[in-house]
Amino acid sequence: MRILLSNDDGYLAPGLAALYEALRPLAEILVMAPEQNCSGASNSLTLSRPLSVSRSAATGFYYVNGTPTDSVHVALTGMLDTKPDLVVSGINNGQNMGDDTLYSGTVAAATEGIMFGVPAIAFSLVHKEWAHLGDAARVAAEIVRHYLDHPLPGQPLLNVNIPNLPYEELKGWRVTRLGKRHPSQPVIRQTNPRGEPIYWIGAAGDALDASEGTDFHATASGYVSITPLQLDLTHTQMLAATRDWARAGSGAS
């Protein structure tokens, strides 16, 4: 078995090292991660300049001067002679639930695997800081082992959020849907030394839909949340209404 491991916090992140150690007994691991923290990079590819790949003398991890998506893209199309059995991303320093998944570099690294036909799992630790990182890595390894032993059909993309709790306090796994957040906080305006305005992106909004069945509800209740995602963004319930709308518009002229 071979696993491609990446993240969005960068190749020096504690979450990456912990996940690597937890997965080593399960498969051959190739690590390819961003050089810098790329939180919020989403599925961006670097097209304006060439990318370079380096290798850490300390860990053997490969890293690229680009995004999480770049990392997986380069590994799959430029380094590996055969497809890995699984792409794994994480462990992220902070949750990726609800709307977070659209911005998340952690989820994006996993998504890039799916783009090339490789099943993928993204792992995030709810709440920042690494208080129970070892416990989260243990859970992640259990989920990966279960997938390798009992693969899901097709090419699944799983988004996993692990409560920041001791292993013994976790209540188990729950399959969930994405919740929803309130809009993010307004940007924070400041002034640079030259008197020019600069802006910091505001904090993410609080949970809007944290009802039972959502990732927010599961993790708040002490469960590991597993949400199956898909690449098809088509709003199927809007197709009929949109056809009627387009038909009326094209006939109006």
UniProtKB/Swiss-Prot annotation:
Residues annotated as binding a divalent metal cation are 8-9, 39, 92
Which EC numbers does the record give? Answer: 3.1.3.5
Query: Family per UniProt?
Result: Belongs to the SurE nucleotidase family.
Enzyme class, UniProt record, top EC level: hydrolase
Q: Where in the cell? A: Cytoplasm
GO terms for cellular component: cytoplasm
Judging by the UniProt lineage, the source's domain of life is Bacteria
Q: Name one Pfam family in it.
A: SurE
Give the gene name: surE
The protein's organism comes out as Burkholderia pseudomallei (strain 668)
Main location (coarse class):
cytoplasm
Q: Which cofactor does it need?
A: a divalent metal cation
- What is this protein's name? 5'-nucleotidase SurE
| Cofactor details (free text) | Binds 1 divalent metal cation per subunit.
